[in-house]
Amino acid sequence: MYWRKKKIFILISLLLICVCLFSGYYLKITIQKANSYSMSTKAFLYLQKALNIMEKKFIYKDTIDWDSIKKEVYKKAEGSVLTSDTYPAIQLARSLIKENHGFFASPSQMELLEKEEFRFEPPIYRLLEKNVAYLSLFTFPSTSDEADQAYNKQVQTAIRALDSSNVDKWIIDLRKNQGGNMWAMLLGLGPLLDKECIGFFIRNNGEKIPWKHKKNTVKQGNSCCLKSSLPPYQLKNTPKIAVLIGNNTASSGEAVAVAFSGQKNVRFFGQHTSGFANATYPFFLSDGACLLLPVMHFSNRLGQIFYTNMAPDEVINANEATNSLKDPTIEAAIDWLCNF
């Protein structure tokens, strides 16, 4: 027993020595690299961390020549002493990898974002000709659970009011929806969604994370994202739905469109969406700055992945959302709802 304990002690000691030697070697190499760009070690490690996050997590990471990118970015950061000195280099990296859905924000910018009070337009709804229900959802930059619940209540109040006219034909207008909290939008629209699984996030390794709507709750996988404070509501009739999309339909607005994609009796009208059909995730750096990156694609319930934008079933060459009865996209939707 004594010799066994002694062997274990010796092995642990050797392991610690190896770790110390490797750490010392790594630190020496890091200092050499930092010196080669006339950067402080702190600034170099900070920039290295940001680049490593991009290289490992960015949704299009496998299409990028990272060696070339890093060379140019480190050159941009030459002479950096403080972590903040590397911010222009990080912005350059975002530009070089053509990252245009997320952002990089300094600690002071993050403080302003957290204090900013976002206002959102409530949904517009009305009964159109031929007893067609019209519901338009705008951008919803959620700030709190209270705001999510208020938004959900507004959307469901609109749906219940329209459904009281015994409608079975619906128009969901997403042409002015540039994103925000997709879960609040999907929860509000729950009565119009016909399946529990309404879409997926797709990781770079192919892993699928389902979007679920059930019993007035929306989930990402098995994790609850939002639960309605209202009782569940069921439509009087099986809905036939026209979804309107366009160039200003973006991000979570595209997620809502994807949730209806593949549903029976649904057709899309308008123009191609913005092309931000992906999920973003915030990565916080050591000084409090935030790097928001797109990390997962959207897929509809049938497994179709939207790598860029989403195309309508019927392209309508018209100006973006006028919310007018003379709107050609609305007219095309009404024609399909009533005649096909």
Walk through the language-model features, giving the residues of each.
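N-terminal Sec-pathway targeting helices
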Residues: 1-23
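Membrane-interface motif at the C-terminal end of an N-terminal transmembrane signal
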Residues: 18-36
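Extended, small/polar residue-biased N-terminal targeting/export presequences
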Residues: 46, 60-130
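C-terminal, low-ordered peptide segments at domain boundaries
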Residues: 96-167, 218-223, 229, 309-325
